[in-house]
Amino acid sequence: MQIQQMLENRIEELEMKIAFQEQLLDELNHALVQQQFDIDKMQVQLRYMANKLKDFQSSNIASQSEETPPPHY
């Protein structure tokens, strides 16, 4: 095989590797964007649930120390 042909084959292999890496990079970027979207959504939900819990705790429910013990005590 001539040196010219070997070089052309090597260049072709490198071009294919670059194409696959570009595709993989695009897929990973898409996955990262989706994960960040999911994280942002979960943070909003967590804040909402934390506020609901605060509201629940500060409602008219007596704390455990204020509750009268059950009759079997």
Swiss-Prot record:
Pfam families: SlyX (PF04102). Transmembrane segments: none annotated. InterPro entries: SlyX. HAMAP family: SlyX. Belongs to the SlyX family. This is Protein SlyX homolog. It comes from Haemophilus influenzae (strain ATCC 51907 / DSM 11121 / KW20 / Rd). The lineage of its organism: Bacteria, Pseudomonadati, Pseudomonadota, Gammaproteobacteria, Pasteurellales. The gene is slyX.
